[in-house]
Amino acid sequence: MSQPLLRALFAPSSRSYVPAVLLSLALGIQAAHAENSGGNAFVPAGNQQEAHWTINLKDADIREFIDQISEITGETFVVDPRVKGQVSVVSKAQLSLSEVYQLFLSVMSTHGFTVVAQGDQARIVPNAEAKTEAGGGQSAPDRLETRVIQVQQSPVSELIPLIRPLVPQYGHLAAVPSANALIISDRSANIARIEDVIRQLDQKGSHDYSVINLRYGWVMDAAEVLNNAMSRGQAKGAAGAQVIADARTNRLIILGPPQARAKLVQLAQSLDTPTARSANTRVIRLRHNDAKTLAETLGQISEGMKNNGGQGGEQTGGGRPSNILIRADESTNALVLLADPDTVNALEDIVRQLDVPRAQVLVEAAIVEISGDIQDAVGVQWAINKGGMGGTKTNFANTGLSIGTLLQSLESNKAPESIPDGAIVGIGSSSFGALVTALSANTKSNLLSTPSLLTLDNQKAEILVGQNVPFQTGSYTTNSEGSSNPFTTVERKDIGVSLKVTPHINDGAALRLEIEQEISALLPNAQQRNNTDLITSKRSIKSTILAENGQVIVIGGLIQDDVSQAESKVPLLGDIPLLGRLFRSTKDTHTKRNLMVFLRPTVVRDSAGLAALSGKKYSDIRVIDGTRGPEGRPSILPTNANQLFDGQAVDLRELMTE
């Protein structure tokens, strides 16, 4: 199946929605001249200034954005296949060529991609891999590069724990003790900031920084208090100092002149006191995780703490506690910790590292089923009445209607319960009759179902579109005081299209998906009286797969081809050439069914990506609804998705009368 067809499977309609991308070329001298000339500007070639651009993007495809930047700047970009998504830029200012390129680097950085210069070309890759490809070349604040920083005075082993909190997750920091140097892979602007900090630390005698180990307070809270005190001027004498929080070791690093550092050290030590809250108890409100689930995890960790602490016998006041209490308050989604200060600090550090926002995954499925049924049936049946009780007939039921059934209906003056499709011709008299049936049917059907659902990483999700059908499982009758009471037991089952998925996001752009997909339906020819003898068709797939972000993959399929031939005839007479057609009935059936299931996962890591994805889906459904509706009527759906919740109802009667 071709790539355009695979992409078409996930398009809600044949109309494509392309976000408006406005790149307007303007000259500074034109604007002033246009105001005086009523908008008709004429600029002599000799007076033209440097070209400027105003860029406004709304849910634009990131690859289209890269193409536009390449046309403007003349740069050559090699784009990694994993570079996908939509970008939005709102700007009213006119940008020069260098400012346009700087904006481009910032947009790539915001969406998790890095531009790595390689000679006359530039590669656009995810941040996770950019650090292995970072090199030299033209320096820009948002470019990823690798730099070696030579340290003159301080040992690099002492600087590593101080600098590591400043390096983001996608960056890299390593020490070379033999050369007393540091290797940093990060964006140029951050490397410059880190290098400035290293130069402040790398002073003779190491007198320009102080390290404070906090015992009772949380380092992030203490750093916030110190920074607020300096910004508001409340910490007199602390001008020129800088506070760095190392959450991994719960330490404060203070940079600056000795007098300023002494002032901040004194303030930090006054904050690090065993209060009633911090000594034994701590209430932590979670922002992203579930309190009940996290309490179970901490409970297992605390059991390990008690087991390790209890191996040496009874614990003292300086050892680990014999009792650790962890409770979850589901109403406020908070954790309550009760233990000694060291244990509370250790558990709180674990909570801070676990309480991080999880990425989400949008899973879109396309279920394509193409089926065809060709049926040919022809038959001749005879009946002869000799009078009295005598008679002869040829009775064939494989064409849908037998002559015996027809005769019984005539005797009882009732019409047959069912009459098959096709041509039915009857001839004869009271003593002789012939019934000729013929049918040629060709049935084709195409089914496309596209269920989709959004779920958190490592969270199972399910969607079902169908019916809840009752199935009779049993019946019995009870006798009580001479009366009978019939009972029937019924079990309801879901029939339709269902999709269950559990995504797991791995490092990089790969995902592991646990998928359960099922299609079930009631067969139309099943007996449905009193919910008995119901027959359902079922096609299901259960698998675990690996897929890239945004990749369209096929997870399973079925190609079925059934051919059946049925023939009923009178022995010997039905085998006579030509004449034998009057004494036999034939039915040929050819059924073909093709079923394929495609899947496309999309990772959503932040609110901006979720908003862009939701906006695109809403725009797609508006395209299906029609911007003006049939015959020019206004669309029922508003232009903005937020207007769906403003409480203003749409009067369909007005739309029908327009």
Swiss-Prot record:
Residues 206-279 are annotated as: N2. GO terms for cellular component: cell outer membrane; type II protein secretion system complex. Residues 302-322 are annotated as: Disordered. Residues 1-34 form the signal peptide. Residues 368-606 are annotated as: Secretin. It comes from the Bacteria. Belongs to the bacterial secretin family. GSP D subfamily. This is Secretin XcpQ. It comes from Pseudomonas aeruginosa (strain ATCC 15692 / DSM 22644 / CIP 104116 / JCM 14847 / LMG 12228 / 1C / PRS 101 / PAO1). The lineage of its organism: Bacteria, Pseudomonadati, Pseudomonadota, Gammaproteobacteria, Pseudomonadales.
